[in-house]
Amino acid sequence: MRKINSAFATLGLAVCLSASMASWGWGGQPIQNVNDAAIVSVKPLQVAQVKTAIMFAGTSLGWKMAEVGPGLIQGTLNLRKHTAVVDIPYSATKYSIVYKSSINLDEKDGHIHKNYNSWVQNLSNKIGGELLRP
């Protein structure tokens, strides 16, 4: 009986420690940027067309997109109490999606909330789809 109680105590301690680690922001995923994704299109595109595709893709997914300079868009996604901000540098041949900042996504030491990477991947997939439109 003592062994069983000891096992339950150990299990309880492990559960509490895991919960504490999660609340401290541990256990997040490494931030995955999209770096120099090649622009695939049925015909060569101008920089303005790439910009339009990126802006439309982001907006259609709920991102607020703003041109902050030539060849640079900033995307902001607000979901409930979470905010993700990315920089999207682009040219006629490639684009990137790079983590800039966040609120309530537990970013620390290059790791972040598990949902962040899927939001960025969805954005990249949507951009790719828009670039393929005739």
Pin down the residues of each PLM region.
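N-terminal charge/polar-biased segments
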Residues: 2-3, 18-23, 130
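Bacterial N-terminal signal peptides
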Residues: 10-20
